[in-house]
């Protein structure tokens, strides 16, 4: 490389006699004289042995490094963190899950800005890795690529992690013996990779590919595969082109690119968490994405992927028929994607998809547009007097489109879960789990344990659940989350009392607490904000700085 442009940042760290101490330290980690003349590419690895989602990412980081080095740049691998949702679910530890998104983002910014990396490649596996990495890349706004760690293979008898959660409910209901629960526990997770359905990790990886920030089909590869290794090498080579042409996240992560991502995740039947995270990712790059965008795009976008949790197939089975590239080609040909959006290949979306073959005849995973699972979005944005600033539900229609029931109110996830397991929740109830929002939790925990218990008890079509917390991508049933304003801020969800009638109407997109305005005002006047649950440490700091879920639950908004 002769141009100084690809060394915009690293030259300040390593050039000139005054930087001899910097070069001396870098020589100790393997730099030679020629390396100081190359672009430096930080490789942000989320490797960790705390979860199978990330246990293999160290080897993927090495493959990325090979690609970077072979293309004439210098790779520098460093680590950031991960928190496993699946392991911490239903415990106090889950309060750190969404917080970890900010820690990942902040740490990528800190390391690559502090060390003068000219470009960055981030590799993620577990749910919060994806938005955390993208937010960090967007903040830095240096040539960047995201690499997905890949999906896990199915467990025995087509099981996955959600099978284990739902088996807990089935055991509590007396439908299966303890030996069957133990067998499912021991055979559902066969090795490395992210949770296998169209849960949060696979949803967000797909969204990032549609954004143009990962290589074609990066989101649809098994974690342990030659294709995933090649994806890493290809990303390492591609970053050099981005450096030479100064193509940055702000050139790729445009409003139209986010519209592409929203369109794709709706067709896939993706996780409600995508709403929160896409808003946050857009905010990091200075693009405004709101709940209204999900409504606008959702009105004209069908759900056509028969994938878990609402469907029957796993991501590994979608991979076998071609991944998401053929779906994106179908969407492009139907005029539903913006083909002129730039991507990390240096080509437009349309150019990347030009030669993609369609799915094989006879496959039943991706349905035709004229025979959708649902004719419009399953991600239903609700308003009404219970959620005047918005709430997010995932309703495919299998649960019905309207639910009216009487409230059973719980001020924590633990209380709600115990009540469900103990049989206190019955058909016709609306379970209200509150004070679990970004500030009130703090940390906006996912309610996979309660929703799985409801399904395992056989109440999936007879009980609704609403919360100011979140839902796992594996949650299913008549569920509404992200209720704003949250209870801790005095939102209407804080005013619900046991026995109140609540109506959730997906067609009118309203969630209504069926009491008079006068009664609502009276309850509001009596309400008092509870004391914060934490006064020091990470969760306390997070609660003081985090924004509303309707604006992405970000922590760096100007005060």
Swiss-Prot record:
Binds 1 [2Fe-2S] cluster per subunit. This cluster acts as a Lewis acid cofactor. Homodimer. PANTHER family: DIHYDROXY-ACID DEHYDRATASE DAD, DIHYDROXY-ACID DEHYDRATASE, MITOCHONDRIAL. Its cofactor is [2Fe-2S] cluster; Mg(2+). The lineage of its organism: Bacteria, Pseudomonadati, Pseudomonadota, Gammaproteobacteria, Alteromonadales. GO terms for biological process: isoleucine biosynthetic process; L-valine biosynthetic process. It is an enzyme of class 4 (lyase). Keywords: 2Fe-2S, Amino-acid biosynthesis, Branched-chain amino acid biosynthesis, Iron, Iron-sulfur, Lyase, Magnesium, Metal-binding. It holds the Pfam family ILV_EDD_C. Functions in the biosynthesis of branched-chain amino acids. Catalyzes the dehydration of (2R,3R)-2,3-dihydroxy-3-methylpentanoate (2,3-dihydroxy-3-methylvalerate) into 2-oxo-3-methylpentanoate (2-oxo-3-methylvalerate) and of (2R)-2,3-dihydroxy-3-methylbutanoate (2,3-dihydroxyisovalerate) into 2-oxo-3-methylbutanoate (2-oxoisovalerate), the penultimate precursor to L-isoleucine and L-valine, respectively. HAMAP family: IlvD (MF_00012). Its EC number is 4.2.1.9. GO terms for molecular function: 2 iron, 2 sulfur cluster binding; dihydroxy-acid dehydratase activity; magnesium ion binding. InterPro entries: DHAD_IlvD/Edd, Dihydro-acid_dehy_C, DihydroxyA_deHydtase, DiOHA_6PGluconate_deHydtase_CS, ILV_EDD_C, ILV_EDD_N, IlvD/EDD_N. The active site is at 472 (proton acceptor). This is Dihydroxy-acid dehydratase 2. NCBIfam families: ilvD, PRK00911.1. Belongs to the IlvD/Edd family. Mg(2+) binds at residues 85, 127-128, 446. The modification N6-carboxylysine is found at residue 128. It catalyses: (2R)-2,3-dihydroxy-3-methylbutanoate = 3-methyl-2-oxobutanoate + H2O; (2R,3R)-2,3-dihydroxy-3-methylpentanoate = (S)-3-methyl-2-oxopentanoate + H2O. Pathway: Amino-acid biosynthesis; L-isoleucine biosynthesis; L-isoleucine from 2-oxobutanoate: step 3/4; Amino-acid biosynthesis; L-valine biosynthesis; L-valine from pyruvate: step 3/4.
